[in-house]
């Protein structure tokens, strides 16, 4: 029987269906028009297979794909044209690479005959994206589409996830081929799931069994591996207190008794201080970023280090490891747990409380329960998380809003934090939140941003308007680039070099997009207006006029070790 002959563009549609793609975030243009023409028939009527979300800027397509991936556990997809359309996605691709987020970016490209001629909207996308993606490939023939798409999704989602780029030449889109579906199940020289070393597992278990002061660092890898239950069984059997990285905040419920708080520069006081006292440090699916370690040479100097990670490249990259267990933590954690003795470390656990009380009295109470003065970011976050019964997805932008909302938001469900961790991309929050509403349509999506980050992708209010995406937007407006301003006060003599911002009338902007809006100036109105936002169907923008010069504490200053964290800043 003869095989069906179809175009490369049609082959792309069928290949995406085979990968169970449901939502595509995109923006059409010249060199991707054949694909969008094929897409037309698959987004309506009886043949409908996909929802296409028309963003207002290609950067937003990449970030929306990230948000979708982070809350759904599936691969996010962005579809854009060549040249500036493709290069506009670079920040999102780099961000996804840093945070191990599985997305596939499909970009149009000029025809093969025009490659290398500086044709209109031509760019060497493969060359540009190779350093910031897991795999970047140019499709030059229609018959290669099914193979390339299947391979792209396999690489994006397997092992340590990440972004993949497909550069789709226009001639390959319109040329025909015999359709035959392809399912990629392995790639030569690519080993995404290393075999776990039983000797390393035994060594790790022995160190933990003999530890008097064990401490676990819970990272994004737990979420990516779906190892939430395995983590809890591991921690509870050996009675190990744990700190969570920024990206690992929802890997362990906030109310779990072994959760001691967030790690990092603006993390919890106890988790940072106790890192320097533990005798065995178990890092699970995290990469020892500089925001966690402070000065690496001074980090946990007394501890034996056990590092569990799926990516061998992370072992010994920053912190010297005593025992490395390379592999998927969904397998490595139970392998270690089976060898653990049932243990109790009550005195060690209780010792965290002294530091927690200090932070509670000097920082937390002042942040979330102020009685006078302007609104504070912490109290806004606290009211929002309580209004959602601690069950919402937190999406945030970058800056002070990111740190404060991550500190005070509470997590009871997995896959509940969407943030730009490694790359620190301002403008990430709004489009990522849009993606999250499609990736987790049954959940409440709360997006915090400052006036700086909001305006970097403010055009995506158009996407929210068109889709009626139910993003609950909380604008923390202090008329400053707050994080930079704080550093200027600390390290540059208080010279606020271009960090004060003149802002537009956000009420008028919301009105123009048909988005419900309110503003909170007096804290007496905060509770009622937050509850109104949460209960209102569809999108909502709540502007909060917060203190202009609010600082984020605790803070570990650059060049300091984690036990030099300060509860108060001295200018």
Segments predicted by a language model, with ranges:
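Glycine-rich phosphate/pyrophosphate-binding beta-alpha loops
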Residues: 29-32, 83, 100, 163, ...
């Amino acid at each position: 029987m003869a095989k069906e002959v179809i175009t490369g563009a049609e082959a792309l549609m069928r290949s995406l269906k085979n990968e169970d793609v449901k939502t595509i975030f995109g923006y059409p243009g010249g060199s991707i028009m054949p694909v969008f023409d094929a897409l037309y028939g698959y987004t309506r009527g009886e043949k409908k297979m996909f929802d296409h979300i028309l963003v207002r800027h290609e950067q937003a397509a990449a970030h929306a794909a990230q948000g979708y991936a982070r809350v759904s556990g599936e691969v996010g997809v962005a579809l854009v044209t060549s040249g500036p359309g493709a290069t506009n996605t670079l920040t999102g691709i780099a961000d996804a690479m840093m945070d191990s987020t599985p997305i596939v970016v499909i970009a149009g490209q000029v025809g093969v005959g025009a490659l290398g001629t500086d044709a209109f909207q031509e760019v060497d996308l493969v060359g540009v994206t190779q350093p910031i993606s897991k795999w970047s490939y140019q499709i030059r023939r229609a018959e290669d589409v099914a193979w390339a798409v299947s391979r792209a999704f396999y690489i994006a989602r397997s092992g340590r996830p990440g972004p993949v780029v497909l550069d789709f030449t226009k001639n390959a889109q319109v040329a025909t081929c015999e359709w035959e579906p392809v399912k990629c199940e392995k790639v030569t020289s690519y080993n995404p799931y290393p075999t776990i070393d039983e000797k390393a597992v035994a060594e790790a278990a022995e160190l933990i069994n003999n530890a008097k002061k064990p401490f676990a660092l819970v990272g994004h890898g737990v979420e990516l591996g779906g190892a939430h239950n395995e983590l809890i069984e591991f921690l509870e059997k050996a009675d190990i207190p744990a700190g969570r990285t920024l990206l690992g905040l929802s890997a362990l419920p906030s109310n779990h008794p072994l959760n001691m708080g967030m790690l990092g520069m603006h993390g919890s006081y106890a988790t940072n201080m106790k890192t320097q006292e533990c005798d065995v440090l178990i890092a699970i699916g995290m990469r020892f970023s500089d925001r966690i370690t402070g000065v690496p040479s001074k980090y946990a100097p007394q501890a034996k280090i056990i590092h569990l990670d799926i990516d061998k490249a992370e072992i010994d990259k920053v912190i010297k490891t005593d025992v490395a267990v390379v592999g998927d933590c969904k397998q490595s954690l139970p392998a270690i747990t089976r060898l653990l003795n049932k243990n109790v470390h009550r005195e060690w656990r209780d010792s965290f409380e002294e530091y927690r009380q200090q932070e509670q009295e000097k920082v937390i109470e002042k942040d979330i329960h102020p009685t006078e003065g302007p609104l504070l970011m912490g109290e806004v976050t606290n009211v929002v998380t309580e209004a959602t019964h601690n069950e919402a997805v937190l999406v945030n932008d970058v800056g002070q809003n990111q740190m404060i909302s991550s500190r005070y938001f509470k997590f009871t469900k997995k896959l509940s934090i969407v943030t730009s961790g490694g790359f620190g991309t301002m403008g990430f929050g709004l489009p990522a939140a849009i993606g999250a509403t499609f990736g987790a349509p049954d959940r409440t999506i709360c997006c915090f941003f400052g006036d700086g980050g909001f305006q970097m992708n403010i055009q995506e209010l158009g996407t929210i308007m068109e889709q009626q995406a139910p993003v609950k937007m909380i604008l923390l407006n202090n008329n400053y680039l707050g994080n930079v301003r704080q550093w200027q006060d600390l390290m540059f003599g208080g010279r606020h070099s271009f960090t004060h911002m003149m802002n537009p009338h956000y009420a008028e902007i919301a009105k123009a997009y048909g988005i419900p809006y309110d503003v909170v100036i007096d804290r007496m109105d905060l509770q009622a207006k937050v509850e109104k936002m949460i209960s209102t169907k569809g999108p909502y923008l709540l502007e909060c006029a917060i203190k202009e010069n609010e600082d984020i504490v605790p803070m570990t200053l650059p060049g300091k070790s984690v036990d030099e964290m300060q509860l108060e800043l001295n200018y």
